[in-house]
Amino acid sequence: MSKRRYTYYQPNDKDLKDNYGDCAIRTICKAENLSWLDAYDMMYRLSREVQCPMNCKYGFEHILKSKGYVYTGISNKKGTKRPTVDSFTKEHLEGTYVLIVANHYVCSKDGHYFDIWDSGECSMYGYWVKEE
């Protein structure tokens, strides 16, 4: 069995026990190389434009689009399996991706995924990739 590509990532030094439920902010921090506060401020400003919370699907999509990300959905046709966070990351060794799983966001960057827990077995529903 091959090695997982998971790296623990917690940019919020106030969340000592990983209890804040701020995966949207953590994901943007890593994807955009921002501090937690800078990511929060940017996301708050952009979510105000559409008057939708930053971690709500529509609000988060608005933020990603405004930063140059493009969405790709993952089909779940009969007889097929969705890729997991770990399998997707192993196949995408370059680039920055925001991965969508059930009720959670994960950043995959240059062949590693970053989270406060090993979300590698989670099945993906889609992903956002930053167009350069």
Locate each region found by the language model.
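Noncatalytic regulatory segments and standalone regulatory/sensor domains
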Residues: 113-132
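Conserved active-site-adjacent core of cysteine acyl-enzyme catalytic domains
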Residues: 47-103, 109-118
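Active-site nucleophile-adjacent alpha helix/oxyanion-hole segment immediately C-terminal to the catalytic cysteine
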Residues: 1-53, 57-72
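Extracellular and analogous surface-interaction loops
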Residues: 28-32, 89, 132
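Intrinsically disordered, low-complexity segments enriched in small/polar residues
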Residues: 4-7, 95, 123-125
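Surface-exposed beta-strand edges and flanking loops
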Residues: 10, 101, 130-131
